[in-house]
């Protein structure tokens, strides 16, 4: 598996993407700006996005010219279609250990950071803390 840089103008969003991701793009852009582009966009052999539509929108908000991509050339068309859905759905199955999360956020709160975890979607009501 090789990570390649692809010009964002060459990437094609999947026309039937069932995910509504406009609300997440700004938070993902803030994450990319703060931590770097750590999760490549998955594309097929025709540069159509398999997974990573939100990351593409975030890259556009940041005016990036290119993004890291992985070509899923080891998957059949059927597997790509299934992976496109599975990749989004499986993350919804995870839950937060609220005690551990509060501890992590509390430790971050004690550090001198140039950002706030609310930049990445955390709500004070979700965690009961100062973020």
Regions found by a protein language model. Name each.
Residues 1-131:
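Short, charged/polar connector segments at secondary-structure boundaries
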């Amino acid at each position: 598996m090789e990570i390649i840089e692809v010009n964002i103008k060459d990437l094609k969003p999947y026309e039937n993407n069932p995910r509504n991701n406009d609300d997440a793009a700004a938070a993902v852009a803030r994450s990319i700006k703060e931590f770097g582009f750590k999760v490549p966009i998955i594309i097929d052999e025709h540069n159509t996005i398999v997974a990573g539509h939100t990351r593409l929108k975030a890259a556009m908000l940041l005016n990036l010219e290119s993004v890291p991509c992985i070509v899923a050339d080891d998957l059949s068309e059927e597997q790509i279609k299934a992976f496109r859905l599975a990749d989004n759905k499986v993350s919804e199955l995870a839950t937060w250990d609220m005690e551990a999360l509060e501890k992590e956020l509390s430790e971050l709160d004690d550090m001198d950071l140039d950002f706030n975890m609310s930049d990445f979607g955390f709500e004070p009501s979700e965690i009961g803390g100062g973020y």
